[in-house]
A protein has these predicted regions:
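Basic, helix-initiating cap at the start of DNA-binding domains
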Residues: 1-25, 29-41, 54-55
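N-terminal intrinsically disordered/low-complexity leader segments
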Residues: 1-9, 16, 79-89, 211-221
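Amphipathic alpha-helical packing segments from all-alpha helical-bundle domains
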Residues: 108-115, 130-156, 166-170, 194
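Amphipathic C-terminal alpha-helical segment
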Residues: 112-122, 148, 152, 169-190, ...
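Amphipathic alpha-helical segments enriched in hydrophobic/aromatic and basic residues
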Residues: 22, 31-32, 43, 53, ...
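Hydrophobic alpha-helical connector segments
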Residues: 59, 72-115, 169
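Short hydrophobic/aromatic patch on the recognition helix
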Residues: 40-50
Length: 221
């Protein structure tokens, strides 16, 4: 008799249950039977869909990182629309217009981190090369992508050219990783627009080219 085929709905239920259990107990301490019970299925049903709890965690992790990459892609598309419809930051737009756009996009990122905060909790407890390698590879890709965008904005005169782009990337990624961990102890969702605006207002004071504001003001007069 051929094995019973996996059920996509059961698989998703198991992943939801695993996400909660991993966030509560960590991957090492989580038990397959607890995951299966929370999903309303048997332990055998778990092994019909996954070879191990580590495999389930890797799929959860890949989905989470995929959400972050999708956001990065949507962000770039939004920036290009903004440049087309409103103007280029530092040249044809005001600081407030650019800040409002970045706050909106960063608040969306924080919403994604909030929805996936249990994964962040599990990652803090995870050990072993497979998961760490996946996250390290993701960080490298994000660093490269963000660094390229920062360098481009420096070339266009929107950001100061005398600041190392890698330092700006460290500040950006470090801040939002810190925000993600700050969420772990929270029961009520915070005001993400306020978080984003506070950070970006401070960041812009340090890295924005002062002359870009004068150029933008001249464009609007």
């Amino acid at each position: 008799m051929s094995p019973r085929p996996a059920n996509p709905r059961v698989r998703d239920a198991l992943l939801d249950a695993a996400r909660s259990e991993f966030g509560r107990a960590g991957v090492a301490q989580a038990r397959v039977e607890d995951i299966a019970r929370a999903a309303g299925v048997s332990k055998g049903a778990f092994y019909l869909h996954f070879d191990s709890k580590e495999e389930a965690f890797r799929e959860i992790l890949h989905r989470f990182l995929g959400v972050l990459e999708d956001h990065s892609t949507r962000r770039r598309e939004a920036e290009l629309r903004f440049e087309r419809d409103v103007g280029r930051p530092g040249r044809e737009t005001t600081l407030q217009q650019t800040l409002d756009l970045d706050c909106k996009l960063d608040a969306e990122l924080l919403e994604s981190l909030w929805r996936n905060r249990l994964i962040v909790a599990a990652l803090d407890r995870a050990a072993g090369p497979p998961c760490l390698d996946i996250v390290s590879d993701f960080r490298r890709r994000m660093r490269s992508m963000v660094g390229s965008r920062i360098a481009l904005k420096q070339q266009e005169g929107w950001l100061r050219a005398d600041v190392d782009p890698e330092v700006i990337v460290d500040v950006l990624l470090g801040t939002y990783e810190g925000y993600a961990r700050r969420m772990l102890g929270m029961k009520a969702k915070p005001d993400f627009d306020r978080w984003a605006r506070a950070f970006l207002s401070l960041l812009y004071q340090g890295i924005r080219d002062p002359s870009s504001g004068a150029r933008a003001s001249a464009t609007h007069t």
